[in-house]
Amino acid sequence: MALLISLPGETPAMAQILLLLSSACLHAGNSARSNGGNDFGVNQPERCSGVQGGSIDIPFSFYFPWKLAKDPQMSIAWRWKDFFGHFIYNSSMPFIHEHFKGRLILNWTQGQTSGVLRILNFKESDQTWYFCRVFLQTTEGIKFWQSLPGTQLTLTQALNTTMRSPFIVTSEFTTAGLEHTRDKRNPSLMNLGAMVTMLLAKVVVIILVYGWMIFLRWKQRPDPA
């Protein structure tokens, strides 16, 4: 759904004012009713989501039945937060809102009826509604319309396993490996020491037993006298 302003010979500023007034009336009393005969409009997805710090795209397209003027002066603008919200981008100036400085890219050229608005370094404060506005000159005068529903952007939380630093994961596995190696190494050394001690004890016992047996035999030997 889109709201159209048609002003033969009028200025874009006047078109902007009438657009706001007409939209206010539409929202106040007739927002639920649609005109099946409309052959113009702006298409935007109902909602898009992205990861914090990444980029997010809002695709758009528009259509109209009129014949373009020799110099159509076609331009694209974007608002945010609500239908009457502040402009964040205007291709005809060009203009970029302070909040989005260095973070907006409009992939669209004159004559095209579709494009993509890309927001870089997506932030939590970017979560709101975005509305595409189209302005052009036709043989019937100025035509100026804007998407009514807009597109809602939301932040998607990434899974913890993907958000954790590889260095931290590697460190944990390395630490666990060292502890595991240490736990395996110390018992081995202790077992080896115990085995040596037991072996020495057995040798001492054997020597004592054999020595005692030799002593007894020597004691029991008949006296040669």
UniProtKB/Swiss-Prot annotation:
What kind of membrane protein is this, topologically? Single-pass type I membrane protein
Q: In which domain of life is the source organism classified?
A: Eukaryota
As for what it does, the entry says: Paired receptors consist of highly related activating and inhibitory receptors and are widely involved in the regulation of the immune system. PILRB2 is probably a cellular signaling activating receptor that associates with ITAM-bearing adapter molecules on the cell surface.
Protein name listed in UniProt: Paired immunoglobulin-like type 2 receptor beta-2
Q: Which residues form the signal peptide?
A: 1-31
Stretches assigned to the Extracellular side: 32-195
Provide Cytoplasmic-side residue ranges: 217-225
| Keywords recorded for this protein, A-Z | Glycoprotein, Membrane, Signal, Transmembrane, Transmembrane helix
- Coiled coil regions, renumbered to chain: none
Q: What is its main location?
A: membrane
Provide the protein's localization: Membrane
Give the positions annotated as glycosylation sites. 90, 107, 160
Recorded hits in PANTHER family, A to Z, give: PAIRED IMMUNOGLOBULIN-LIKE TYPE 2 RECEPTOR (PTHR15549), PAIRED IMMUNOGLOBULIN-LIKE TYPE 2 RECEPTOR BETA-RELATED (PTHR15549:SF15)
List the GO cellular component terms.
cell periphery; membrane
Xref: Gene3D superfamilies: Immunoglobulins
Transmembrane regions listed in the UniProt entry: 196-216
